[in-house]
């Protein structure tokens, strides 16, 4: 497989870096798109290219990973260039809630265009796979770290809201498999962590990993929203997220087994994610 090249967009992000590593571990060559190739610090053997060079970067690749934030407003042009280059396969990452009403997708407030990018890939006329992860465990950093700088309490509403957050490495490894394995073509693959956890249960799990007696304190939604906004979160995002928590509070959380069935190992737990990122909370 030494001559097989894979092109990764969004290559320096939360998913991009572990995806590059996962592909390298399979012995294939990787071409990685990043806005700052000279500062990307990829492992040896990775060819870093700027977005402006995407036309030439597409030549000769076996498959292309389309990151929704990297593609975004340029998706149609990227699809045109991929078709022009005869790219044999596209793998796109969207989200598990991509079919929900757009007003019910909090990440859109931060600029995500999962629905539009996934649709452009599916409509491109090229073979495709769509990977639809649930919320990343990594999101807890942005949600809780500000509060935990000043104490051991996470204050928030809807402590009974549960979801099966996913480790970014599981997402990256699933995408790598989709790039490498043609048996997944034409599938929309929803992936989650191994178990649904309530917010008020996740906080003490994090505490056990970092050696602190953390706990969750229920507060009214209005008070929580004000605190989240003070900690730097976008106001529209906060209100859309809390509306989602309220709307889904009493619904069974979605838990899939696709990670285990496709990759052959169980999805990593939230406790594992916390241990892997313990230093980020210092």
PLM region spans:
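Rossmann-fold cofactor-recognition segment
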Residues: 44-54
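Residue-level recognition of oxygen-bearing side chains
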Residues: 53-56, 272
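A hydrophobic C-terminal alpha-helical subdomain
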Residues: 222-282
């Amino acid at each position: 497989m030494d001559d097989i090249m894979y092109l990764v967009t969004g290559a320096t992000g939360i998913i991009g870096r572990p995806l590059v590593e996962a592909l390298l571990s399979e012995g294939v060559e990787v071409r990685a798109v990043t806005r700052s190739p000279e500062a990307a610090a990829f492992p040896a053997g990775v060819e870093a290219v700027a977005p402006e060079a995407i036309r030439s970067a597409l030549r000769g690749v076996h498959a292309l990973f389309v990151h929704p934030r990297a593609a975004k407003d340029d998706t149609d042009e990227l699809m045109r260039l991929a078709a022009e280059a005869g790219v044999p396969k596209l793998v796109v990452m969207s989200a598990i809630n991509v079919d929900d009403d757009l007003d019910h997708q909090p990440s859109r407030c931060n600029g995500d265009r999962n629905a539009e990018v996934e649709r452009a890939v599916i409509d491109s006329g090229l073979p495709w796979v769509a990977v639809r992860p649930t919320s990343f465990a990594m999101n807890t950093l942005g949600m809780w770290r500000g509060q935990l700088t000043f104490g051991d309490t996470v204050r928030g509403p809807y402590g009974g809201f549960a979801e099966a957050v996913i480790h970014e490495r599981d997402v990256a490894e699933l995408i790598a498999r989709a790039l490498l394995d043609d048996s997944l073509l034409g599938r929309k693959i929803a992936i989650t962590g191994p178990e649904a956890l309530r917010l008020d249960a996740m906080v003490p799990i994090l505490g056990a990993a970092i050696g602190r007696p953390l706990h969750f304190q229920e507060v009214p939604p209005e008070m929580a929203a004000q605190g989240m906004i003070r900690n730097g979160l976008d106001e529209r995002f906060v209100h859309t997220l809390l509306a989602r928590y309220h709307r889904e509070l009493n619904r069974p959380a979605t838990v899939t087994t696709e990670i285990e069935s496709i990759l052959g190992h169980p999805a990593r737990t939230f406790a594992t994610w916390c241990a892997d990122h313990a230093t980020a909370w210092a």
